[in-house]
Amino acid sequence: AFFQGKNDRAQGFSYEHRGEKVTSVVYDFSIVNPPADIAAQLGIAEDDFAYHVVRVRQADEKPIVIEYTYMPLELIPGLKKKDLYGSLYRFIREQCGLKISSFHRTIRAVAATEEEAERLDTKPGSPLLELTQIGFLDSGAAFEYSVSRNVGDRFELHNVTSVSYTHLTL
């Protein structure tokens, strides 16, 4: 069956947790040549540069998710470490003037590594919900490749799915 999810806006962590005190702990902010498989997902050459961000997002001082993100340097100019403590999607919209149009997501269950467990205030091996996503701009360019690992009992996924009957097979 073919299903298509639809959101009316790019809803990141800050939006989903509006009304709560949202904070970030940044563990890495660097400019790198991304691994070949990630460069391919972003549609850039292996020798092109990308931001690499590792941060934990918290709601009301409770760690919810650890994010591992790559973004092409050329598409998102001027990103600074101070911007990582707020909404990256807001920075992309307001500071870069870009329009986020869609995400391709894969969701699966994984076990927390020792390092992730420490950063997320949980136990090693605890269940995490992993969202791997590629974010696209209205131009069709991929602006983000990220893997987010969410603490299972502190995360909810809300999705609206519409069925396209022209592609539906039973």
Question: Where are the regions that the model predicts?
Answer:
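Conserved small/polar residues in nucleotide/adenosyl-binding loops
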Residues: 166-170
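Acidic, proline/serine/threonine- and glycine-rich low-complexity intrinsically disordered segments
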Residues: 162-164
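Acidic, metal-coordinating catalytic segment for phosphate/diphosphate chemistry
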Residues: 154-160
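N-terminal helix-turn-helix DNA-binding module of bacterial transcription factors
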Residues: 1-3
